[in-house]
Amino acid sequence: MRHCFPSNLRRTLEELPKSLDDTYKRILKEINNANQVHAYRLLQCLAVAGHPLRVEELAEVLAFDLSEGGIPKLNADWRWENQEEAVLLACSSLVTIVTDHDSQVVQFSHFSVKEFLTSDRLAHCIEESQFYIPIEPSHAILAQACLGALLSLDHRTNQYDAWQFPLYGYATTYWVGHARTGNVELVIKESLDHFFDMDMPYFSAWFRREFTWELSTDSVQDDSDVPPSAASLYFAAWKGFRGLVERLLIKHPQQVHHLGGRFGTPLHASLQEEHFEVAQLLLAHGADINSRCGRNFTPLHFASEIGHLKIVKWLVNHGADVNSQAAHGHTPLYLSSTRRHLDICRTLLEHGAAVDTLVETGSTPFLEACRFGPTDIIFLLLDHAQDVNVRHPEHRDDTPLHWAARRGPPEFAKKLLERGAEVNLLNSHNYTPLLLASQYGQSGVVRLLLDYNAHWYVGAHDENGDTSLHKSVGHGHIEVVRMLLACGAGVNSPNNLGFTPLHRAARYWTPSPHALDIVQLLLDYGADVRARNSSGKTASGEAFDGGHHEIVQLLSHHPAE
C-alpha cells in the first residue's frame, strides 16, 4: 500500500481479498504451475504429520518417486541443495519456517490454512479444488515416503548411521500410524509386501535396529541379534495389518505357531492392541488360542494380568482355557485376583474358572484375594470357594478367617463364618482368629467371633504365651479390652516371660491415648499389681523402665501397691 499512488489507493483497497478464504485462494493461484505437484505433496504432509516436520524431512519427501501403487524409490538427483528454498518455493506464503531446538521446523503460517485446505469449501471451488487435501490420501503419501526411507537402508546400516538419514527417525516413529489410517493399507499394499518380505533385508534390518528389546526376552529363543522367522507376521499382527497378515499366512502358513517377539506368537501380538479381526484370521489359519510364550503364558494369562476385559471376553468366547496354569502354577483367575481386576474375575468365574486351584506356593486364587484383595473380589471368590478353611502353607498356615481377623471388615469374617469357617483354628504360630483380631484392633470382628463361641477359647495363647487380652492391651485397643474382660478373659494370666496383661499394659508395644484407661480397666477387673514377671518386676517396675511415669503414679495409688 505504501507504493500506491493516491489516485489508485481506493481501487487497490477494493481489490483486496474479502476473507481469509479469498486470501488463500489468491495464494494458491499464484503457485507456479511447475511447482504445484511438489507444493501439494508438501501441504498434504504438513496436514497429517505426526509431529512438526523439519525442513530436511519435508525436502526429503520431494526426493521420493511415489508413483501410485508402486514401491517408493529415493532419487538422489531430486534432492535440493538448498532445502529451505525448496520448501518455500513450493509452498509460497502458506507455510513458515521457525527455529525449534536448533532445528528449522516447517508449519502452516496460520491454523486456518490447514482448516481451509481440508474444508469442503475448497473441495467445491471450481478453480482451486485441485489443492483440496483429503486426509486419507495424505496419510498414504506420508506412509509411502516413510516406507521409502526404510527401504533405502539394509542390514549394513547400523542404528546410529540410520538416524542420520533425514526422514528415517520420523519414518520409524510414525509410519505405522499413517499406514493404519482408513484404507491406506490397501493403497500401499505393494510397498508393505516388499518391506515385510523376510527374503529381503529391509524389515529384518529395521526390526533388529529398532526392536532389540523384542529380541531379548524369554519369548524368543533364537540368536538375540537375528529376528525370528515369524517376526514379520508377528509385527503385522501386532499393528493390525489384516490384509498383510493374510498374505503372509498364505506365504508362510507354519509361522502362525512360531514365536515372533516379546509378546509371544502372532496371536499374542494381535491381541495387545485389540486387533480382533486379525486374531480371528490367525485362528482360522490354525493358531492355538492356548499357545504359550514367556512365563508359559497363554493370551488369556496376559489379558487377565494386565486387566484387559475386552480381550478376556473375546478369548473365553473363543474357547480359551480359563484354568490353564502358567509358570508357578498361576491361572488367569489367580493373576486377575492378585491384580484386583474385579470384572475379569467375574468373567472368568462365569466361564468356569476354579477358585481353589493350587499354585506352587500352596496358595489359591481365593487365598490370595483374602490376603490382598478388596472386599468385592473376596466376596465374589468366596461365593465360589469349596473350602473356606483352606490354609496357606507359606504364610503361617493362615486360613481365610485369620486374614479376615487381621484385615477386616466384619462383613468378610461374617460371610466366612456363615459358610462354616472354624472359629478357633490355630495357625503355625499358635494364633487363633481371635488373637489376631485382638492384636489388630478389629473390634467388629472380635465381637462377631465372640458371638460365634470364640469366648470358649478366650484364654488361648500364641507361641509366646500371649493371650488375646495381652495383644489388645499391648496395642492400646480399649474397646477390644472391654469386650474380652466382659466375657471372662484371664486378667492375671502370665505369658512365657511371666508378663500379665497388666505388665503388658504398663510396658505397651504401641503408644495409645487410652494407656491409662486400659490400666485402670484392668485394675477394676482385679489385676494383681504385685505379680512379678520372670525378671522379678511388677507392672509398676515395667512402667518405670519404660518411662511411663503416669502409669507408675496410677499404680502407686492402688491399695495393694
Regions found by a protein language model. Name each.
Residues 431, 439, 457, 462-466, ...:
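Eukaryotic tandem repeat interaction scaffolds
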Residues 225-233, 258-266, 292-298, 325-331, ...:
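Ankyrin-repeat boundary/"N-cap" motif
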Residues 1-258, 265, 269-280, 284, ...:
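Leucine/isoleucine-rich amphipathic helices and adjacent mixed helix/strand linkers
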Residues 240-257, 265, 269, 273-277, ...:
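Cross-kingdom leucine-rich repeat
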Residues 235-240, 269-275, 302-308, 335-341, ...:
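Ankyrin repeat A-helix N-terminal signature
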Residues 247-255, 280-288, 313-320, 346-354, ...:
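Ankyrin repeat domain, specifically the short helix-to-loop turn at the C-terminus of the second helix
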Residues 529-561:
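Leucine-rich solenoid repeat scaffolds
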